[in-house]
């Protein structure tokens, strides 16, 4: 078992992993410590390749463990966001955020000017590149707890408003993220879910799911099976 860490300087990434307790559970592998590799995605509308950490190629299977929550740019972050931005190297993150316009990290201004739907489509396409490479050797778990409207990557996120919902798993990342979105909207406490719903709607968050379906990455229909006792 390895934790995957990306894009910050190696020493900083290692320190953060230790501070958050990851190193006590499993070895941490900083995938882009040795650079990037390209995963082709010919079907892409926005990007024709995904740039991931070169150590990605050392693995023959992955479990994508994601904290489902809001996101200031994507609207929500789940399996697809984690698979795209999470696996991406530093340059790969810029490539996705600029919808294939800029590869080198540096000034983040171009990313802030990217069309929203183009950004969401780029994330879906980067996920597709990872899925094409791994085939059936990948599974997904979304943990729905401490749901803030902001991502964990935000240094000063809004406090979580929604209570824990549960842990969901699937072999289909599209269905998994759709189920999580639906559970947010189905929350009986509308006052606490309102902010996250508004964040997703403002960012047109479901478009990543729409485009993922267009690309054949999964389905938005699902059967939610409860296994808790």
Per-region residue spans from a language model:
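Short, small-residue-biased leader/transition segments that mark boundaries at the very start
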Residues: 1-13
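Extended, low-polarity segments enriched in aliphatic/aromatic residues
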Residues: 11-229
């Amino acid at each position: 078992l390895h934790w995957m860490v990306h894009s910050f300087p190696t020493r900083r990434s290692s320190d953060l992993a230790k501070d958050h307790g990851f190193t006590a559970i499993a070895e941490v592998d900083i995938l882009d410590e040795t650079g990037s590799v390209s995963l082709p995605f010919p079907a892409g509308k926005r990007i024709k390749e995904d740039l991931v950490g070169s150590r990605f190629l050392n693995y023959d299977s992955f479990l994508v463990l994601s904290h489902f929550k809001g996101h200031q740019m994507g609207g929500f972050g789940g399996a697809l966001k984690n698979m795209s931005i999470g696996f991406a190297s530093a340059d790969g993150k810029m490539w996705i955020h600029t919808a294939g316009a800029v590869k080198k990290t540096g000034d983040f201004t171009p990313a802030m000017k990217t069309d929203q739907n183009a950004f969401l489509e780029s994330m879906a396409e980067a996920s597709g590149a990872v899925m094409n490479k791994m085939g059936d050797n990948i599974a997904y778990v979304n943990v729905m707890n401490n749901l803030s409207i902001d991502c964990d990557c935000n240094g000063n996120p809004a406090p979580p408003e929604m209570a824990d919902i549960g842990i969901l798993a699937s072999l289909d990342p599209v269905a998994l993220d759709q189920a999580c979105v639906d559970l947010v909207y189905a929350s009986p406490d509308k006052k606490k879910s309102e902010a996250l719903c508004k964040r997703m709607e403002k960012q047109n968050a479901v478009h990543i799911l729409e485009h993922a379906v267009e690309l054949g990455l999964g389905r938005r229909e699902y059967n939610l099976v409860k296994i808790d006792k």
